[in-house]
């Protein structure tokens, strides 16, 4: 795909406690055109990962409409800017019955609740699908009419860039390998804990191989 226009960039500021702040200048890489999907295989997918950043853009509605025509379980991670997504577009995503993957602050903000348990239940009532909430060092919790919990892995936080993306990616991988909900949450917590203990978003080859081996042995 080749587009006319300027590319964007993202500056990541990581503080001494590992917390990060992004300054993003969105370019053509955040845009979407429905005809792009005509050139790729669109057979049924196990999961379709939808990120809030792209949905927020002017072409986000076209993206949501295209995703609605695909066969597969949508997993939606709105991210911290998710509340900037137009309400009608957000409702269109909820109508796809996506798995929601959010952190605690996002769950409270999207639900309008003050406590995490009713917040999760409120989001589940809207989507009718699994809601996953990451809780930092306290692990993660999920709800689909039943509750699932998995403890976190103690670690020294160096850089939180990639914590959420690595968690949702690891969860998807674990589920595809046949792990049950609690096992998948635990594996995702482990991967995320290793990411935040490293500078940048890449694990060493040794870490990657160890995680792959662990996943295959479950």
What are these regions (language model features)?
Residues 1-2, 14-99, 104-148, 179, ...:
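Ribokinase/PfkB-type carbohydrate-kinase core domain
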Residues 116-218:
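Conserved phosphate-binding/catalytic region of the ribokinase-like
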